[in-house]
Structures are given as structure tokens and as C-alpha cells.
Amino acid sequence: MEQVVLLNDSGQAIGVTDKATVHHLDTPLHLAFSCYVFNGRGQLLLTQRAHEKRTWPGVWTNTCCGHPAPQEAMPEAITRRLGEELGLTVRDLTLVLPRFRYRAVMGNGVVENEICPVFAAFTDDEPAPNREEVAGTAWADWSGFSAEVLAGTTDISPWCRQQVAELVELGANPAEWPAADPADLPDAAVIAAG
């Protein structure tokens, strides 16, 4: 059974719970990650969440999101999920937003509540989606996509919308985004990365 790391407001681990039971009307704060994968042309790989997902089914979002297992290093968790969901290998995995946090509520009241460090990476692969996780994929020009997200003219997951607003502040070219200091990760992630 897949487990997620529960957090306090300071980002310290306070326990674990089964992933299958964590998302509900009063979802506890937990540790996650988001990854934005680009190709050599600077295009972002977008994914459509599988229609069977408990949270935001069928919604388009960034390349990959997930939860590190207890004591699992963030890079290993990201590499694992990219392989499981999309059959991708990546290079230059870079921490870019170490303390991103959000809370979002679906129309049915189910809550997502995460401290979710954001990473960027690059690939030469084409995705081979696992249909249990990903309903569709598309490559999108970063500048056009980010402009549409900021203008509110494209439907995208709530976390992706908030992340894009912060990512554009890092610069126009994702290949030149500065690496964040891993010491700025929440304590639970630093412990997991040890």
C-alpha cells in the first residue's frame, strides 16, 4: 500500500498514512512534488490526469505530480513516478520552487492540501503513458502556455496555475531557471533526501 508523509505547518513529518485514504473533505497537509519536463525545443510536456483519479480526474496539468514514500529521496521519487506514469527518463533534474504550498477544493468538496516542492527536468524521450495514470499528453511551447495560464484562458489544475505564476518569475527560458537551495526544502523532504 502506497503511503504519504503527513506534515505540520512547518513542513516537519508528523506521521504517515495510506495514500488511498488521505484525500477527502478534510485532507491533512502532506508532502508531494511537482515536476515540469521539457524537451530540447523548450516545450513542456503536459499531461491529462486519468479519468479514474480521485482528485481532479481528466484535468490537464504539468508533467508529473506525486508523493515521495516515507524516507524516499525527492529525486528518486520523481524518477520513479516519471517512469511509472510516462516511461520517461530525464536529465538535469533541478529543484526550482522548494517551498511551494497550496490547498485546493474540488467541486465535490474533496481537498488537496500539500507542501509540494517543484522541480524542472529535460528529456529526449517521447512519453509512453500508463493509461491508469495519464489519459493524454501534449507538448506545449512554454512561453505560449504560461501566457495562457496567466491570462486564465486555459483549463489547468489549480496547483499548476499557481506554480506557473511563480515559475515565470524565474525567467523566460526554463533551461536557465536558477537551482534553489535544497536547504530550503521543508524539513520532511530534507530528511527524505538524506
Curated annotation (Swiss-Prot):
Residue ranges of every copy of the Nudix hydrolase domain listed in the record: 28-162
Binding-site positions, Mg(2+): E85
Protein location: Cytoplasm
MF GO annotations: isopentenyl-diphosphate delta-isomerase activity; metal ion binding
Cofactor annotation: Mg(2+); Mn(2+)
EC supergroup of this enzyme: isomerase
Record: residues binding Mn(2+): H23, H30, H67, E112, E114
Protein name, UniProt field: Isopentenyl-diphosphate Delta-isomerase
Organism of provenance: Saccharopolyspora erythraea (strain ATCC 11635 / DSM 40517 / JCM 4748 / NBRC 13426 / NCIMB 8594 / NRRL 2338)
